[in-house]
Structure formats: C-alpha cells, structure tokens
Amino acid sequence: MFKSTLPIAAAISVALTSMVLPAKALAANEAKTNQFWWPDQLSLSPLRQHGAESNPYGEQFNYAKEFASLDLAMLKKDIQTTLTDSKSWWPADWGHYGPLMIRMAWHSAGVYRVHDGRGGASGGQQRFAPLNSWPDNVNLDKARRLLWPVKQKYGRKISWADLMVLSGNVALESMGFKTFGFAGGRTDDWEPDLVYWGPETAMLSDKRRDKKGKLKGPLAAVEMGLIYVNPEGPHGKPDPLLAANDIRMSFGRMAMNDEEIVALLAGGHTLGKAHGAKKPNGCVGAEPAAADIEAQGLGWKNKCGTGVGADTISSGLEGAWTVTPTQWSSNYLDNLMNFNWVLTKSPAGAKQWIPDNKAAANLVPDAHIPNKRHAPIMFTTDIALKEDPQFRKIVERFRADPTQFDLAFAKAWFKLTHRDMGPRARYVGAEVPSEVLMWQDPIPAINYQLITDKDIKQLKKQITNSGLTTSELVRTAWAAASSHRVTDMRGGANGARINLEPQNSWAVNNPKELGKVLAKLEGIQARFNKKSAKTKVSLADVIVLGGATAIENAAAKAGNRITVPFSPGRADASQAQTNVKSFNYLKPKADGFRNFYTDDSYSSPAEMLVDKANSLGLNVPEMTVLIGGMRALDANYDASSYGVLTNNPGVLTNDFFVNLLDMKTVWSKDKSNAGIYIGHDRASGTEKWQATPVDLIFGSSSELRAIAEVYASDDADKKFINDFTKAWVKVMQLDRFDLK
C-alpha cells in the first residue's frame, strides 16, 4: 500500500546546558558519518547495535541463570541497609534514600511507550546518555552511585536494569508498603540504545504535536527530556485541566489507564519531596554527559551553599506532598482533597501550589533541618487529579477505601516496572507473583504431549496436500511470527493470536486470504488431535510448520533439499486472553518484508524497513537475505508483483538479487503510480519488473548493495538458502523464550 514566562524547567535546562552540540565538540580529526554529508542516506546503525561482542561477559553469558542463583533476600537486605546509610556527599532526605530510589526506578521504567515498545527498564539505559543527562533525570546519577557498592558486591548476578527496579521495590517496602512482587531477568545493555526521542534539538522543548495538540508518532513524553509531563503544566502554564489532558495522553501512550494514572501519581507523591532550594542560574553545573572528566560521570554539581542537602536543586519545585514523606499512607489523597490550593512559586521560581490555610504551614518536617517545618505542596499535575472529573472520581474512591488504593498502586507499580519484559515466561526469581495479568499477554500452559518427528512428517505431508500455495503459507507464518517486537517482547506466533481479533482483521494480514488459510490449517490440526488423546498440536505450531513446509518445498523446486528446523511447543491463546486495544499497538504501519506501507507511517519506506528489522532483532545481512527470500517466495501482503524479480515466483532462489543488480535493467519512476518504479530492458525498452523503494534500496544503498552482491554471485545458491532459512527460523522463534 504505497500511497510568555520562561518555565522554571526550561530555565534549569538553559542553566545546565542547552544540550545542543557545541561547534568546538566537532574536533578537526573527528570522523563524520555519511549522514552528515548526505542526510537522506539510509542509516543501518539500528541494525548494528547491541552486538554480542559489546558484552564484556561474552556471548554465552546466561544472566537469567545467574540471577536465579542469587540470594535475593540477602541482596534486598543490603539494599535496605544502603537506604538509611546517609552519605555526606549526598545526604539523604530525612535520613532515607527510599524516595530517591523510587524516582530512579520509576524514571528507568517510565520511558516505555506502547506504540513501538521502546524504552523501559530493561537494558539499564538510564546509565547512558541521553537518558542519564535528561533534565527530568537530574541527580539520579547519585542514586546509582549510592547503589554501586551493592552492584559491586553481587557483580554478574544482578544487572543494573534489575537492581534499579528492585531498589525501588525495596524502598517502598522499607517505608511500609506491600509491593505486588518482583521479577528479575532484565539484561544490561552496554551502549546507548538508538531511539527516536523526538524532533527537537534542545531539551525541554516541544515540537512533537499535531495541530490538535496530540503527540506524533510513537512518542509518549510531552517534551524532550521529560519522562512524562511538565509538572508545572503544559509548557509551564499552571492550568490543571490542560495538565490532565497531557497526563492522560502521555501516560496512556505508556500503557496506563485512568485508574493506574491516579494510583501512580498519588502513590509516587506519597513519599519524598521535590528539590528547588535556589534558582539554578549560577548554581547548577553541567549534566553528566557534558561534565568535565574529573567529575567521573556525575553531573549537576551545585556550587551554591553546601550544594547538597537543604541546598539541593533538582526539578526546581520544592517541598513534600505529605506529612510522612518516608512512611506509606493515604495522606496525599487527604491533603489533595481537604485543602484549597493556591498558586505560588518555589524558591527556584517554579510554579507550584500550597494550601490557603495558614494552619497548614507547619505540617511537613524539613528534610534536613531539625525543628523546621513547611506546608505541603502540590504540582499542577497533582491538582489535575482533583480538577479533572474522571480523575477526581478515582481519587475519591481511593480515599474512601485506602486498601483499594494500596492494591491499585501495587499493581500499577508492578506494571510500570515490568511492562517491557514481555510475557511471564521471562520472569525469574522467588518474588514473581502468581496472579496472571491481562497485560502480560497470557498463553495457556501445555498439558499434553508434544508432537514427535514422525508426527511432524505426517503433518507436513497433509499441509503439502492441502491445496494451499507456498506464498499463502509463507505469508501466514510470517504474519504470525513477525508481530513480535524485541523492544518489549510482545507478539509472535506463540498463542496463535493471528487467528484472533484484532490481528485477523489487519489489512497487512490480508484477512480474506488469512481466513481461508487458517481454516484449512485448523482442519489439519483438528484431524490430528482427534486421533490421539495424549499427543496434540496447537494451531500456532501448525502455522509455523506450514511456513517451514512451504520453504522446504520451494527449495526443492530449485533443486535443493533442506530441512527447516522446527521446535513444537507453542500454545493457543483465546480471545478472552487477548486485549484487543493493547494488541492493536502491534499493528504495523509498514512491513517492508511484505512490501506493505501506509501513508501514516512515521518515515520513508526504506527507513520503516530498517525500523521493522530492528524490532525483529535482525542484523543487516539477515534483513537483506529475508527480503530476497520473501520476494522469491512471492510473499507480498497483497500478492502484488512488486519486487518479485523472478520468472519463477514461489521457488526459493536468489533471483531477486541477480535481477536487481543486472545492468541490463534500467529503473525509472512510474508516472501513474506514486512510489512505484518500473524496470525496463536497457536495450529494447520492454518493461520487465515493478518494484518499490524497499526493493530498490538494496541496489541503491552502497552498504546494502555490498551484501546483495554476495547473494547475487554465481556461487551463492547454497549460502543464500542456508542464510535465509536461518534468519527465517530466528523470526519464527523470537517468542520461544523456553528455547533460550
């Protein structure tokens, strides 16, 4: 388908640095990327990140196994000891680092977004720029340094990604809250993730909305450098109702509903305080990424007063929300609803709210100075919970039943910190909760014997004789498996959700053809299962086996006998186990492997292909060989001939590469069909092929052409088939966490 007053947050950002690369940083001897000279050139960098060679523990390192061997109780005890061991270089508020650790964990997980699954706690990306230097993460570098002795003690058995989240849990528990549970298993990354965080070139700026004020693309935060929303209100305007709109939009794009939003904001602001002791100008130094080398990775050095403790400057807002900032309670809800709140400014100049009742002026103990007390405060985003009618109903319900509030926060916190981990099969540790939650995309446990090699041969024969074509079987298997995203480990063939709403209605899956194919595969499944009381096969397995069978037959037609590796063990989910709205976020706007592209795609067809390959965890050669194989197998989503550069569609050959690189063909734009190119015989002018930008990029991009040449060579036949098969199986097994 080719068709007014500067907000305090902004002031702090300017005071710290604009985060725009200074000219002097472009050293004379610094290599410039090709994109520097040719901005429109396709970047393949996303497919080259996080290689096994970047992991100092080595390619064979099994973190889940290491974590499983950990003494979790002892680790939690060590974290708890750290929470109350106040250090002079960063004194703890009220002698307790708990609120700081909660903020660290929250901001680590809170960059997750549902539209592309990127962000989240996995990988421990908060250690790296840009996240470690975002204005909203100011002074969280200290939280990680406080935890370093714990990380140092346990080494490879606890990742930073897990440690940050676990420390947030321990902090909550140490302050009297009962958490829902904790799952380990988040591996660490060793380099910054290449993520599109927005179009802006300066921190705390906003150029990411459409004319209606909605966020564009996959973005979730409302400004560059924020985790969610501006606490002072949209663009610093202290309007609670406008803030409510931003909150609902931003948190919604991070997979949270209204109840979860209220629970998280109220629960998070029950503990701790904001820091804005002084105006940042002239006080606060550069963020970690811009700090001098002797700072050793720490940033935001404050030269005013002691620079720490009572003189701390973080967000610029100042104060605590409750009278017990280190003890869990429902006081936040009471304060929010009981007081009439009036607008004021913090010592740093940030817009915030205090009670109009002077009797409230001494309710909150100072975090560092004995016998000094303050009024509680609220952000504009807090007042939004009171002013927005829907949020207010939830606040009143929680206030009337604090136990309901506690459970709602516990579950919302667990979801926040585990959303990007994928299904429960990836959870590790003694504190994994037993309750199965809908957002975990549950799949039933297998309670039957799996099919044997003999059964597989029998099923392959039935599939071959079913009347289904190679293209139909390949398209169906790909549609099922390629819904997986390695970004948040959602989707995939397991569960056979390709047979359920919403996936069976997606245009990219060609619903009419899909229904026909699945009906025949279900018939094969039913006949097999009827024969045996103990041995069963799932539809999910039959779908993947159908793709394998088709590829074997297509290779045989080219004179190559191969066996596509197949591992049974997938199960079938039900419609009741499938949240339609949630799964619709997996709906592809483009899938270059099937030559599918929509007008509301975030970027060009070639860029969307790279994005899709990245979400499948593919490298450049894997992406390349899969494109060649899918075109040879005639697997375009709509059965079109675009890019099917072969006279033998449905036969697994390297014809796509051979014909694409053939100098006897000259390409030109199709004047009557935007986005389509026509390949003519250079000598006669006869039309030979039609193709899309996704097809032609493998001859146009010098990097992709280099790989295409490998597969177009006369000696590439076996290599092409072997590499295609290996890459195909990789995609089919992306969600088979039981095999890893």
Curated annotation (Swiss-Prot):
Signal peptide residues are 1-27
Molecular functions per Gene Ontology: catalase activity; heme binding; metal ion binding
The UniProt record lists the EC number as 1.11.1.21
The cofactor remark states: Binds 1 heme b (iron(II)-protoporphyrin IX) group per dimer.
In this protein, the active site sits at: 107 (proton acceptor)
Reaction(s) catalysed (UniProt annotation): H2O2 + AH2 = A + 2 H2O; 2 H2O2 = O2 + 2 H2O
PROSITE patterns xref list: PEROXIDASE_2, PEROXIDASE_4
Cross-referenced InterPro entries, in alphabetical order? Catalase_peroxidase, Haem_peroxidase, Haem_peroxidase_sf, Peroxidases_AS
The biological processes this protein is annotated with in GO are: cellular response to hydrogen peroxide; hydrogen peroxide catabolic process
Task: Give the positions of the site Transition state stabilizer.
Answer: 103
Instruction: Find the cross-link Tryptophyl-tyrosyl-methioninium (Trp-Tyr) (with M-254).
Output: 106-228
PTM field: Formation of the three residue Trp-Tyr-Met cross-link is important for the catalase, but not the peroxidase activity of the enzyme.
Cofactor(s) demanded: heme b
- Quote the cellular component terms of the Gene Ontology held in the record: cytosol
Q: Does the keyword Heme apply?
A: yes
Question: What role does this protein play?
Answer: Bifunctional enzyme with both catalase and broad-spectrum peroxidase activity.
The record's subunit annotation is: Homodimer or homotetramer.
List the NCBIfam families hit by this protein, alphabetically.
Answer: cat_per_HPI, PRK15061.1
Q: What is this protein called?
A: Catalase-peroxidase
Organism, by scientific name, is: Colwellia psychrerythraea (strain 34H / ATCC BAA-681)
According to the entry, what is the taxonomic lineage of the organism?
Bacteria, Pseudomonadati, Pseudomonadota, Gammaproteobacteria, Alteromonadales
- Gene from which the chain derives: katG
